[in-house]
Amino acid sequence: LLFTVCLHHFLGCDLDRVYEELGTRFPEIVFVRCFMDPIMQKHGLTPDQKLRKAMYDPLITKEPDPLTVTLVGSDFVLDESSDIKRLLRSTGHTLRELPACKTWAEYQQLGSAGVFVSCYPPAKYGADMLAERLNRTHLYLPGCFDYEEIKEEIRSLIKELQAGWSREDTSNTECADITSEEIEAFYQREVTLCEDSINHAKSIIGDTPVVLDYLYHPRPLGLAKLLLEHGFHVTTVYLDSISPEEKPAFDWLKLHHPDLELRATIQT
């Protein structure tokens, strides 16, 4: 992984020529073009978006496996209790993740997925480009705090898995047989468990003031809305911008909790 910095841009370095020469001299090494150019954050793609795309550029085209799903652009392996992991496990699918890869061969298997999924906003661009390059489907299922949005994401994932099953005529009856009633039952169970956990947390935290930072989650306003709806004493949210994905939460907070402070991170 080679990181170029602001100085390379100031000096007008011919980076294409540099990488070409490196590839010629060391053909056995794959050089990934990474970026550390904060001066360019305000225009176009951010360094984070470009890096998350670059991490998957070495993947080569493979025969798609309809029973494999690759999670793109995440920093950590999904927890075993995550919705996506449990759903895929129940339908006989294999989930592949970059942080779980230990060898180059395992890394290359990421490209064998029939479906790519991304959950982190800065990963969406790279996942779109990867899916287009390898001629696959990409589902953007962002982490969120609204039950109905989560429900629709679950439906979208299962619908795409069933479509892949149908196209390839596989024998994956577990996925094909999932009904709307079963999805609804799964959803209701998850909501109940979530509500129980939130209420348990509230019984411990009580009226202690809560301050949120956008570095914890890309949807801090959605989290603030969830907590306030459940009686938590959220006082401040630190963030430098408001994502379009957060507009419904922002509008709700403005109407129901106009006293909530939104502060720029420079004010910490």
Give the label of every model feature segment.
Residues 1-268:
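An N-terminal assembly and electron-transfer interface module characteristic of large anaerobic redox
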